[in-house]
C-alpha cells in the first residue's frame, strides 16, 4: 500500500511532466509565431486592446509619448506580469508570460515594418496616424525602418526561445527536486 507521501510525490512528478509538455507546446506555437509574425493570433486581440490603452495612459506626456505609448504599453504589460511572477518566485509562470512578451514584440515589429508602406488596417481608418511612421519620421529614422523592425523581431524571437528553455529547465528542475 502506498503512503500519502508517495502519492503526493507521484502527483508532483505528474504536474512537472505536464508543465514540461505545456512549455513544449507553447514553445512550438510561439516559435511558429516567430517564423510567421504577420499572421494574426488570438493573443493579438489582447495586445491590440493593451496597445490602444497605452495611448490613453501616455497621453499626459505629450503627443510623441502618447503615440509611442501604444507599442510601449503593449510590451510593458507582459513585462509587469513577468516581473510579478518572478518576484513571487514562480519562475515557470514567468517563463510562460515571457512567451507573451516575445509574441507582443513580434506584433510590434510587424507594425514598425509597416511604417513606410502603411498598409496595415488601423482602428481609426484612413485618417488615423500610423504610430511607427509618425515616430520614425519625427526621429528622422524612416530610412532605418527595416533595421529597426528586424531588431524588434529578433528580440521577440530571442525572448520566445529564452522562455522555452527557461520553462523546460524550471519544470525539469522541479521534477528532479520532487523525486
Tell me the role of every PLM-derived stretch:
Residues 47-59, 70:
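Active-site recognition of the HExxH zinc-binding catalytic motif
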Residues 4-36, 63-179:
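Metalloprotease/metallohydrolase-associated module, dominated by Zn2+-dependent proteases
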Residues 43-48, 66:
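Active-site alpha-helix of zinc metalloproteases
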Amino acid at each position: 500500500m502506498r503512503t500519502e507521501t508517495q502519492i503526493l510525490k507521484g502527483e508532483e512528478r505528474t504536474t512537472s511532466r505536464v508543465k514540461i509538455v505545456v512549455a513544449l507546446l507553447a514553445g512550438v506555437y510561439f516559435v511558429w509565431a516567430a517564423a510567421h509574425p504577420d499572421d494574426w493570433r488570438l493573443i493579438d486581440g489582447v495586445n491590440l486592446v493593451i496597445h490602444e490603452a497605452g495611448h490613453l495612459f501616455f497621453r499626459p506626456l505629450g503627443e510623441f509619448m502618447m503615440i509611442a505609448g501604444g507599442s510601449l504599453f503593449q510590451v510593458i504589460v507582459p513585462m509587469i506580469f513577468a516581473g510579478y511572477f518572478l518576484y513571487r518566485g514562480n519562475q515557470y509562470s514567468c517563463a510562460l508570460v515571457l512567451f507573451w512578451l516575445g509574441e507582443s514584440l513580434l506584433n510590434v515589429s510587424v507594425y514598425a515594418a509597416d511604417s513606410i508602406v502603411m498598409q496595415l488596417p488601423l482602428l481609426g481608418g484612413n485618417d488615423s496616424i500610423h504610430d511607427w511612421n509618425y515616430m520614425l519620421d519625427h526621429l528622422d529614422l524612416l530610412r532605418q525602418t527595416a533595421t529597426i523592425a528586424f531588431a524588434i523581431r529578433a528580440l521577440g524571437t530571442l525572448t520566445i526561445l529564452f522562455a522555452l528553455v527557461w520553462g523546460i529547465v524550471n519544470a525539469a528542475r522541479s521534477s528532479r527536486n520532487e523525486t
